[in-house]
Amino acid sequence: MILGQLTEIQNLVSIWIVLMTAVAILCFIVSEITRNYSQVDKLWSLMPIVYSWITSAIFPSSRVFIMSSLVTVWGLRLSYNFSRKGGYNIIPWKGEEDYRWKVMRENSLLKGRLRFGLFNFFFISFYQNILILLFSSPLLMAAGNQDKPLTIIDLLAGVFMLTFIIIESIADNQLFRFHQEKNRGENESRRYKKSLRKGFMTEGLWKYVRHPNFTAEQLIWICFYFFGVAASGQWINFSLTGAILLILLFIGSSQLTEGISSRKYPEYSIYRKEIPGFIPWKFFPPAKNE
């Protein structure tokens, strides 16, 4: 029984890896042909859903079903947000490209067709697809322990994950409305007048941290990791790698974004000094000295 289940897990991992490799190669080829390097961005919110339901079909259990359902809610919401910003197009390989890839193409270390092509192959197309697979990997822990009953850890992980999905949705909606008002250039009936004067978002959840949507996204996948903890009984297991690498990616991404904003908006450096990046530590009450 144990050997049979191990073989099934190995087969599932093989399916994931083959699928991930095929998608990465496709993203590389399409992005090189079209010069639109946001092909992985289009699939970022969709691939975890695919991994989830493949796992659920092969290893049906209450835990895997709950995890797959939460990932589907997360993915559909994020896909909707990406779509309304112009990320998807009726022609699949078209759509809005993330402005940061254009900035990266102008970087002296990456400038040139060959250099950026290598960066596209190793980082944009392959590393990011590997990362998606890794932060989805708590599903493998749940699949390998499908007979383990649900615990209080599952309940807490599910409640907090759903909470952070809602927070991320609020943050994304606030930012989307801000950019709508900014693009319309209206002078009346504007919700984010203070932010519009500065040119960047400083209201709503942005009063507390500079990247509330990034904070929520990282916490979503940390919560997801705890389903694997509940299934395996191991507080530290291999699936933690995905959450850690995702956090590192967001740290690097936010630094790139903030560098661009600092050059573009004179007041951004002040905002950067006054408001925390991810954790609203500044708004916690200070400890009292005895």
Protein language model annotation of sequence segments:
Residues 6-24, 47-82, 88, 129-174, ...:
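Hydrophobic transmembrane alpha-helices
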Residues 1-10, 111-112:
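Juxtamembrane membrane-interface segments at transmembrane-helix boundaries in membrane proteins
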Residues 97-147, 158:
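PAPS-dependent sulfotransferase catalytic domain
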Residues 25-32:
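Transmembrane-helix signature of polytopic, lipid-linked glycan biosynthesis machinery
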Residues 39, 126, 209:
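Generic enzyme active-site microenvironment
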Residues 35, 39-50, 86-121, 199-206, ...:
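Juxtamembrane helix-capping/reentrant segments at transmembrane boundaries
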